[in-house]
Amino acid sequence: MWIYILVGIICLLAGLAGGFFIARRYMMSYLKNNPPINEQMLQMMMAQMGQKPSQKKINQMMSAMNKQQEKEKPKKTKK
């Protein structure tokens, strides 16, 4: 009788771990394919703040944001 409970708990833990890693992988690929901010959104935000966005300025801000994301990646993988 106790073996069924033990097997059930082990299966539950394995399912939770598997689900977590599948969901994590899905979200990583989703965010890589669909970044949370793009050039059009950045241009609109700058216009709302009263700045006239030039393409050079937008490219600089996008590259700075990408560098920041790349810098944060190694910190997350070490944990």
From Swiss-Prot:
<feature type="region of interest" description="Disordered">
    <location>
        <begin position="57"/>
        <end position="79"/>
    </location>
</feature>
<dbReference type="GO" id="GO:0005886">
    <property type="term" value="C:plasma membrane"/>
</dbReference>
<keyword id="KW-1133">Transmembrane helix</keyword>
<feature type="transmembrane region" description="Helical">
    <location>
        <begin position="2"/>
        <end position="22"/>
    </location>
</feature>
<keyword id="KW-0472">Membrane</keyword>
<comment type="similarity">
    <text>Belongs to the UPF0154 family.</text>
</comment>
<keyword id="KW-0812">Transmembrane</keyword>
<dbReference type="Pfam" id="PF03672">
    <property type="entry name" value="UPF0154"/>
</dbReference>
<protein>
    <recommendedName>
        <fullName>UPF0154 protein Lm4b_01315</fullName>
    </recommendedName>
</protein>
<feature type="compositionally biased region" description="Polar residues">
    <location>
        <begin position="57"/>
        <end position="66"/>
    </location>
</feature>
<dbReference type="InterPro" id="IPR005359">
    <property type="entry name" value="UPF0154"/>
</dbReference>
<keyword id="KW-1003">Cell membrane</keyword>
